[in-house]
């Protein structure tokens, strides 16, 4: 792979550009970052992400222009190790976990990362969501999963945060190719109604509403209450509902709904509405289908690219825009192309007639680039 500098424009896909730059060893230049904005340049959370990636690598050089609208990133080797970081309250901790998950198998020493900030936020995947659905996909590519964990020591909601998450991951020499096209049938729904610094009766109202929203779909629904007090509850009051559906093949879909952050304008969301919203979001995710949750498609695409030179298949549901752009970035950084087939066309006639959710599923096939962990010390 050539080491010429790749040039990008704009602030979108910032974290995957940095992660892919480190994995491929190719320097990048990002220009015109919010150049027409009232506050041009990179935001505080983006500079924190750069700082975090500098801590888990060795020899990374970053140049940020005076206005902050241009970043030149020259990647180093991935070392991993023990790192503590305060992520601030602008973005959810999952924003920082995403690049870490992509880099973690290829470190010199296993990662132990302690992140402080917001664990659950509206409009973003939560740390719970990553723990439930991403780690399941991670396991398929990395066999040694004994150290793999995302521990939520304290929950933190916006605007104050106060959550604490510890991420640990194993290291491997190479990933293994994966063939996943069986989805199976949904056999159980599990969930967590979390309340921090508010009365726990709200949790039971959310649970009731969610069960009513999913009534008639499946009987095995079990939702626990996660009530956090003191420091474990973070610094802001709030409540939300996180749901997962597991299939007979071990595929996990996840969905979440959360209350409005304290001090935000607008009508407060009732616990009943949150329960209904989470229930419907989960049913929508199940309908979309695929052999993984749609948010984890980027993880599967990246790991399929970094596999040994062998074929991997993965059945995706409809691809969100973020996944499509991730595939384009993989082509730019690793010169890899994915073969995508309409899943309906690959089925036999009697299978195609079964009502198995969305018709827009794609069978994604790729041959890995033969990536191996050169940082790992061999005993």
From Swiss-Prot:
A GO biological process held by the record: endonucleolytic cleavage of tricistronic rRNA transcript (SSU-rRNA, 5.8S rRNA, LSU-rRNA)
Keyword Zinc part of the UniProt annotation: no
Intracellular or extracellular location(s): Nucleus, Nucleolus
Keyword line: Nucleus, Ribosome biogenesis
Gene Ontology terms, MF aspect: RNA endonuclease activity
Cleavable signal peptide: none
GO cellular component: nucleolus; small-subunit processome
A Pfam family reported for this protein in Swiss-Prot or TrEMBL: RTC_insert
PROSITE patterns, alphabetized: RTC (PS01287)
Function: Part of the small subunit (SSU) processome, first precursor of the small eukaryotic ribosomal subunit. During the assembly of the SSU processome in the nucleolus, many ribosome biogenesis factors, an RNA chaperone and ribosomal proteins associate with the nascent pre-rRNA and work in concert to generate RNA folding, modifications, rearrangements and cleavage as well as targeted degradation of pre-ribosomal RNA by the RNA exosome. Does not have cyclase activity.
Family per similarity comment: Belongs to the RNA 3'-terminal cyclase family. Type 2 subfamily.
Assembly information from the UniProt record: Part of the small subunit (SSU) processome, composed of more than 70 proteins and the RNA chaperone small nucleolar RNA (snoRNA) U3.
This protein's name: Probable RNA 3'-terminal phosphate cyclase-like protein
Taxonomy of the source species: Eukaryota, Metazoa, Ecdysozoa, Nematoda, Chromadorea
């Amino acid at each position: 792979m050539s080491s010429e500098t790749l040039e990008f424009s704009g602030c979108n896909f910032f974290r995957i550009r940095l992660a892919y730059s480190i994995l491929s060893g190719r320097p990048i230049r990002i220009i015109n970052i919010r150049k027409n904005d009232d506050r041009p340049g990179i935001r505080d959370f983006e500079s924190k992400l750069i700082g975090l990636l500098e801590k888990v690598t060795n020899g990374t050089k970053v140049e940020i222009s005076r206005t902050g609208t241009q970043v030149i990133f020259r990647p180093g080797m991935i070392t991993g190790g023990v790192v503590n970081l305060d992520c601030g309250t602008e973005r959810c901790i999952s924003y920082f976990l995403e690049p870490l998950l992509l880099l973690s198998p290829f470190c010199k020493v296993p990662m132990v990362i302690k992140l402080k900030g917001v664990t659950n936020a509206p409009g973003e995947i939560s740390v719970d969501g990553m723990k439930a659905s991403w780690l399941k996909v991670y396991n398929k590519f990395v066999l040694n999963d004994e150290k793999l964990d995302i521990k939520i020591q304290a929950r933190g909601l916006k605007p104050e945060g106060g959550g604490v998450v510890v991420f640990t991951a194993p290291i491997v020499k190479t990933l293994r190719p994966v063939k996943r096209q069986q989805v199976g049938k949904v056999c159980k729904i599990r969930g967590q109604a979390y309340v921090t610094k508010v009365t726990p009766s709200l949790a039971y109202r959310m649970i009731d509403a969610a069960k009513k929203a999913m009534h008639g779909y499946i009987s095995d629904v079990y939702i626990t209450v996660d009530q956090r007090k003191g420091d474990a509850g973070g610094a802001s009051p709030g409540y939300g509902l996180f749901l997962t559906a597991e299939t007979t093949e071990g595929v996990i879909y996840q969905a979440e709904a959360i209350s409005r952050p304290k001090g935000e304008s607008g009508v407060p969301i009732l616990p009943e509405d949150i329960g209904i919203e989470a229930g419907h979001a989960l049913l929508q995710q199940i309908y979309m289908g695929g052999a993984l949750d749609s948010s984890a498609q980027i993880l599967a695409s990246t790991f399929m690219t970094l596999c040994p030179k062998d074929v991997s298949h993965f059945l995706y549901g409809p691809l969100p825009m973020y996944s499509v752009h991730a595939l384009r970035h993989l082509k730019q950084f690793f010169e890899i192309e994915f073969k995508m087939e309409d899943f309906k066309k690959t089925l036999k006639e009697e299978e195609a007639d079964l009502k198995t959710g969305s018709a827009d599923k794609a069978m994604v096939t790729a041959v890995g680039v033969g990536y191996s962990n050169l940082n790992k010390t061999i005993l």
